[in-house]
C-alpha cells in the first residue's frame, strides 16, 4: 500500500507546521508527517514554511530575525487566516517527540541551506527522511549521516532521476508526474512521492501510475484511496490498443515518451470550470502511428519535430 504523508502537518485540517496538525495527521491514519524547518536567530530549529512570519503567524518580519523565545510568543494562523489561540511555533525537537509518540514517520524539509549538521543531530531512524530543493545540501547531509534523503522538484526536468542520483537521494518528491518518471525511478530503486495531492480522483490516477506515497494537505481524504489496491486504467475504451510503441505492455503504466511536449499541433490547452488552464494530450495520436513508433523505437532520443516529419511523410505518400 502507498504511504500517506501529511503535508505541512496536515495543513488543511489545522494550522500548518503545528503540533495540532501532527495530532490530526495521526487521527487520519497518516503514515508520515512532513515538517518544514528553519533556523531562529539564536540557532534553534523551528517549524515554519515561509521565510516570513506574516502569512502563518500573528507576527511579521523574518523567522531568522527572532529568537526562539520571541517566536514562542506568536500564534499560528489557520488556512483561512484566522488565529489559532492554541497553536504556537513548535521546535523541531517538540515535533519529533510528538510524532514518535504517535508512531508517525517523519519527512523533514530543510527550507534553508546550512542546516545539515543540526538536522543530523536532531533526527535519526529508518522512518525519517530529509528533503530539500537544495540538492547540494542533501549530498552534504549524506556525507555526515545515514539519514535517507529525497529531492524536491516543482517542474518536471528532462532527467529527474539523474538529479536524484547526483544528489545521492533515495526518493523524488515531484510536483508534476508522468508514468515515465515512475518507471525510470523505480528501475533505479528510487521511491516517488508526488505533492500535493488533495482529491481522491487525483490520488487514484497517481496511484495507478505507481506512486510509492502521496503528499497531501488532507490525509483523511487521501487515506481512503491509498488503502485501495491500485487498479490498471485498462484498455477497454482505448482507441489505440494495441499500442504500436509498446506492443507487449498491459496498459497498466501507459505513457507518452514525449510528454510534456506542449506542442500546439498535437494537443491543446483547455480550461476547467473554474477557469484554470492546463495542457491536454487527449487529441494527440502521434506516437500511435506505426511509422512514427518504429522510428522512435530506433531513435529513443528523437525530438517531437523529427516525429512530426515522419507523420507528414506518411500523409504525403
Where are these regions (language model features)?
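Phosphate-group recognition and catalysis centered on beta-loop-alpha active-site segments
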Residues: 1-226
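Cysteine-centered metal-binding/redox modules
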Residues: 227-317
Amino acid at each position: 500500500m502507498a504511504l500517506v504523508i501529511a503535508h505541512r502537518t496536515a495543513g488543511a485540517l489545522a494550522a500548518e507546521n503545528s503540533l495540532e496538525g501532527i495530532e490530526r495527521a495521526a487521527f487520519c491514519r497518516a503514515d508520515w508527517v512532513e515538517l518544514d524547518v528553519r533556523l531562529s536567530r539564536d540557532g534553534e530549529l523551528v517549524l515554519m514554511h515561509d521565510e516570513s512570519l506574516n502569512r502563518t503567524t500573528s507576527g511579521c518580519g523574518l523567522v531568522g530575525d527572532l529568537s526562539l523565545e520571541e517566536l514562542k510568543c506568536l500564534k499560528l494562523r489557520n488556512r483561512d487566516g484566522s488565529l489559532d489561540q492554541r497553536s504556537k511555533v513548535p521546535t523541531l525537537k517538540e515535533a519529533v517527540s510528538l510524532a514518535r509518540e504517535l508512531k508517525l514517520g517523519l519527512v523533514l524539509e530543510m527550507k534553508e541551506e546550512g542546516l545539515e549538521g543540526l538536522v543530523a543531530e536532531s533526527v535519526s531512524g529508518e522512518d525519517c527522511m530529509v528533503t530539500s530543493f537544495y540538492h547540494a545540501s542533501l549530498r552534504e547531509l549524506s556525507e555526515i549521516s545515514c539519514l535517507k534523503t529525497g529531492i524536491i522538484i516543482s517542474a518536471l526536468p528532462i532527467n529527474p532521476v539523474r538529479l536524484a542520483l547526483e544528489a545521492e537521494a533515495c526518493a523524488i518528491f515531484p510536483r508534476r508526474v508522468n508514468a515515465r518518471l515512475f518507471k525510470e525511478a523505480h528501475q533505479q530503486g528510487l521511491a516517488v512521492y508526488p505533492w500535493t495531492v488533495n482529491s481522491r480522483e487525483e490520488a487514484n490516477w497517481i496511484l495507478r501510475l505507481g506512486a510509492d506515497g502521496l503528499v497531501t494537505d488532507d490525509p483523511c481524504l487521501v487515506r481512503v484511496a491509498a488503502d485501495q489496491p491500485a487498479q490498471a486504467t485498462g484498455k477497454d475504451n482505448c482507441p489505440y490498443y494495441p499500442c504500436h510503441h509498446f506492443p507487449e505492455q498491459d496498459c497498466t503504466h501507459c505513457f507518452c515518451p514525449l510528454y510534456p511536449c506542449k506542442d500546439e499541433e498535437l494537443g491543446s490547452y483547455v480550461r476547467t470550470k473554474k477557469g484554470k488552464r492546463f495542457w491536454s494530450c487527449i487529441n494527440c495520436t502521434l506516437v500511435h502511428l506505426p511509422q512514427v513508433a518504429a522510428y522512435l523505437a530506433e531513435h529513443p532520443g528523437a525530438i517531437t519535430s523529427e516525429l512530426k516529419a515522419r507523420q507528414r511523410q506518411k500523409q504525403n505518400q
